[in-house]
């Protein structure tokens, strides 16, 4: 969510070079560390968990955060870069807690049915959630009238800053609306879930008791012994993936800015880079629906997760911070690098998450879903910390 709004944050932090260079890695690190911590805590709270309540709480928290972000684009503009970075990181912290609640609730809830396609649906939904912010950011930028090409450089910079601010306002407001719609869409699912549990266990006094009675508390070590290859694969997969946002917000079109159409200006090209990656990710996750599947071959998935690191050097061939590209092609960057890196992430991540239920007992599936989600977030956290090494590349 925060990554696709990079042009807006670059405008807010432009008077502090240190923050401008490292805000992306700071956002990623705070987000993933908080997410991992919340997932570990929630994973240890299996016996009394109400997963539908966790999902609803996450959506309410997201709505509050996105409203505050929308307000911040128009008010408190005189806040220093350091002050606004602090506010942004608090918002990241809050959304990461919400993400932990939602991921834990959704994966555990879906895993309890023992149907891999339910996990695949969640993974695909996450990919769609990655595509929509990029699309919203691009549309919001293009919706603003283009600047006067005859204006001075100072005027153009000021106009670009205002455009990024308006785009960010529309962007965060759209996220608020989507979160509200999702919250209302969740209520029928919760009611259906309650009816299923009540019909299964009419002897118990409440739906929450029915949920808890059928739940088996499983230790992390027990799950690791059964799922170590898949857990390692999903960890490495997402650790490698976390380098892409750092490079994406640095890479601009090979077409000179004074000759580039508006679609290739940094304000739109950076979101297009995120969109290309997320579309590849969506395609990769959907490809797991094909009859050919590798989720029953965890060692092969582990080897593939290591080989996937070969995508990272390809970013060095692109136009980082407009310093020139080795391969002077936006097509190469968007389709081969971003699209390919995203597609392999979607396919590998989904295959690992879907395969977990095949290697545990039925009573352990719910815990296995939460366990795999923890490894996924742990990979994101490790990758975000390692991505600081790439922050200084230009």
Model-derived features: where do they sit?
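Eukaryotic helix-linker segments that join adjacent hydrophobic helices
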Residues: 26-97
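Eukaryotic endomembrane system proteins
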Residues: 100, 115-233, 237-242
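A late C-terminal transmembrane helix in Major Facilitator Superfamily
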Residues: 330, 334-343, 352, 357-392
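Central cavity-lining transmembrane alpha-helices of secondary-active solute carriers
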Residues: 26-47, 64, 131-134, 271, ...
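Membrane-interfacial loop- and helix-cap regions that link adjacent transmembrane helices
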Residues: 7, 16, 64, 72-91, ...
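Small-residue-rich segments within alpha-helical transmembrane domains of MFS-like 12-TM solute carriers
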Residues: 96-104, 241, 342-350
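A gly/Pro-rich, aromatic-decorated transmembrane alpha-helix motif that marks the paired
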Residues: 40, 127, 131-146, 378-393
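Loop-to-transmembrane helix entry/capping segments in MFS-fold secondary transporters
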Residues: 18-22, 104, 111-129, 267, ...
């Amino acid at each position: 969510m925060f990554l696709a709004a990079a042009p807006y944050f670059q405008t807010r932090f432009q008077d502090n070079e240190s923050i401008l260079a490292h805000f992306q890695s700071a956002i990623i690190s705070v987000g993933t560390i908080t997410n991992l911590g919340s997932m570990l805590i929630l994973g240890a709270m299996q016996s009394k968990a109400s997963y539908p309540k966790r999902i609803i709480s996450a959506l309410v928290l997201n709505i509050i955060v996105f409203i505050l972000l929308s307000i911040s684009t128009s008010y408190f503009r005189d806040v220093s870069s350091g002050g606004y970075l602090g506010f942004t990181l608090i918002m990241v912290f809050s959304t990461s807690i919400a993400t932990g609640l939602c991921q834990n609730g959704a994966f555990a809830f879906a895993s309890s049915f023992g149907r891999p396609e339910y996990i695949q649906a969640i993974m695909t939904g996450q990919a769609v959630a990655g595509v929509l912010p990029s699309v919203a950011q691009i549309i919001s930028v293009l919706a603003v009238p283009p600047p006067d090409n005859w204006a001075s450089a100072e005027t153009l910079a000021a106009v670009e800053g205002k455009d990024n601010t308006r785009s960010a306002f529309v962007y965060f407001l759209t996220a608020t609306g989507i979160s509200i719609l999702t919250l209302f869409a969740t209520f029928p699912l919760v009611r259906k879930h309650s009816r299923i549990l009540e019909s299964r266990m009419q002897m118990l006094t409440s739906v929450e008791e029915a949920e808890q009675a059928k739940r088996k508390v499983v230790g992390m070590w027990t799950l690791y012994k059964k799922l170590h290859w898949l857990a390692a694969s999903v960890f490495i997969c997402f650790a490698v993936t976390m380098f892409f946002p750092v490079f994406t917000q640095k890479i601009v079109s090979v077409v000179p800015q004074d000759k580039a159409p508006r679609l290739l200006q940094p304000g739109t090209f950076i979101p297009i880079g995120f969109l290309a990656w997320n579309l590849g990710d969506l395609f990769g996750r959907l490809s797991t629906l094909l009859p050919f599947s590798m989720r029953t071959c965890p060692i092969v998935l582990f080897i593939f997760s290591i080989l996937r690191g070969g995508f990272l050097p390809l970013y060095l061939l692109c136009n980082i911070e407009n310093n020139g590209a080795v391969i002077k092609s936006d097509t190469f960057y968007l389709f081969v690098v971003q699209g390919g890196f995203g597609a392999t992430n979607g396919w590998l991540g989904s295959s690992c998450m879907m395969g977990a239920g095949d290697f545990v007992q039925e009573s352990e599936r719910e815990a296995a879903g939460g366990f795999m989600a923890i490894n996924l977030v742990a990979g994101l956290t490790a990758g975000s910390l390692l991505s600081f090494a790439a922050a200084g590349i230009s």
